[in-house]
């Protein structure tokens, strides 16, 4: 079976148990299918850019035991490129091009770093649609994270609200951010303005916010069960995992047109995508999905029919590993 070294700058650690949890779960899912693996976590949050440079010798040494190196995030890929492993490489972009190069103000510099990364890697995975200028379908692959459909499902809303200490009669708009609700990309200001617009129309505080930030995985599902709508107000995303988890729980979704959300929501009941950050239009969409009659089981079933469950996605990922490993052995 194929052996894979994972290099990532997002992974759960003490003090941030939900950070990069989707990468951790993807690695575990591949391991369940027989992939032997090890992970190098570059904690750039605490170590800054120097952490990437310091990781090079460790990446080089460990990579010699593996068939393929999978780099999660552009910066992990650039550190691995400098490590000169001599191994086939997979680079996963975690958000839209060129926003992957976070922390850099110059759009030209961002684009340059992204270009260097995709030129270096043997396979490049995008969670959102592949940028149009990258035309090699064998090298550039659209493969969003899969959702664990056995864990995320329809639960009783009243019981979930009781466990979270929420008002049984309010309408809750769910906001999700793994790094805190004031993360600029997530546009909490647009979210709150939409909530305020809805309450102004209602004439009282009918709509309330429900913030899902830095919660253990066993608690997260209660937030999806307790909410009435997941409102995604971000300026950009890759393939937002919160949308997939919400839909798997049957929760209606209203989202701006970011990442691959339009593809995920197309044809689903109680799901709307808008190419706008206007709180008035977002409020209209919230009222629209709340007025539809489809139940949560119908939303879940329609979403799962799209093949974005974890097993289906992981099988495709393992196929990429196996192809690269075979090519290296020739």
Give names to the regions the model predicted:
Residues 18-21, 291-326:
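A charged, aromatic-enriched C-terminal amphipathic alpha-helix characteristic of glycosyltransferases
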Residues 71-76, 93:
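Short His-centered aromatic/hydrophobic patch
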Residues 60, 97, 106-124:
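Membrane-proximal helix-turn-helix segments that form the acceptor-binding/catalytic region
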Residues 115-142, 147, 151:
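A short, active-site helix/loop in glycosyltransferases that binds the activated sugar's phosphate group
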Residues 5, 166-186, 192-196:
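Conserved donor-binding/catalytic core segment of Leloir-type glycosyltransferases
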Residues 235:
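Aromatic "clamp/platform" in nucleotide-sugar-dependent glycosyltransferases that forms part
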Residues 252-255:
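Short hydrophobic beta-strand element within catalytic cores of glycosyltransferases
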Residues 267-279, 288-293:
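Conserved acidic donor-binding segment of nucleotide-sugar-dependent glycosyltransferases
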